[in-house]
């Protein structure tokens, strides 16, 4: 439903009168004012709201409005970019409510909890998924996913990857059948071992 709120911004006040392409342009623009962002977050045009969720300068107020929308699409986009900060237990609650055992949302789940991909111009560096939940997600992966080195590499690249998870990936056997999608597992294991060394060194320094 379109909001009846009166804004100071002429753009915000006229969102309801704009063409979809005009809303999209404002949603993508990093310098769109906060009132216009909020008006877009409250408008009916879903694609415009998706572009807003992907905007690196989305405001907290607009992000909160998108977060409160039904479903998991906006939630996954905001989580992947670190736009929403949750308590540790809330990450697990969101995962179990919207993504666990839901094959339709697998790609969105990976985006939400492991961060965006290189082709999305995002990374896992802003992603705050707790280590315990990363281990739960790893345990929930289907057999096909555990045979894709790219999927496993996203766990290693996550800033909260645990020592236990890195060790498990470092001992992964080669998949029974290599395919176009399977990168070298030897390289993957080596990267996981480097992560083990990194975590071990960090923990040793922290304990001094």
Language-model features and meaning:
Residues 2-208:
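Alpha-helical scaffold segments
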């Amino acid at each position: 439903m379109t909001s009846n709120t009166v804004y100071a911004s002429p753009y915000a006040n006229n969102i309801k009168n704009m063409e979809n392409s005009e809303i999209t342009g404002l949603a993508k623009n990093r310098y769109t004012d906060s009132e216009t962002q909020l008006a877009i977050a409250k408008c009916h045009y879903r694609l415009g709201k998706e572009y807003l969720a992907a905007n690196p300068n989305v405001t907290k107020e607009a992000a909160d409005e998108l977060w409160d929308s039904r479903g998991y699409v906006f939630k996954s986009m905001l989580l992947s970019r670190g736009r929403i900060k949750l308590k540790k237990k809330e990450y697990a609650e969101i995962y179990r409510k919207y993504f666990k055992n839901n094959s339709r949302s697998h790609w969105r789940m990976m985006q939400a909890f492991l961060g965006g991909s290189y082709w999305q111009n995002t990374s896992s560096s802003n992603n705050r998924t707790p280590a315990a939940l990363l281990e739960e997600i790893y345990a929930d992966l289907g057999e096909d996913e555990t045979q894709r080195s790219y999927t496993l590499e996203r766990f290693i690249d996550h800033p909260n990857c645990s020592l236990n998870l890195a060790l498990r990936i470092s001992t992964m056997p080669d998949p029974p059948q290599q395919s176009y999608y399977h990168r070298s597992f030897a390289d993957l294991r080596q990267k996981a071992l480097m992560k083990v060394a990194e975590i071990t060194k960090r923990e040793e320094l922290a304990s001094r």
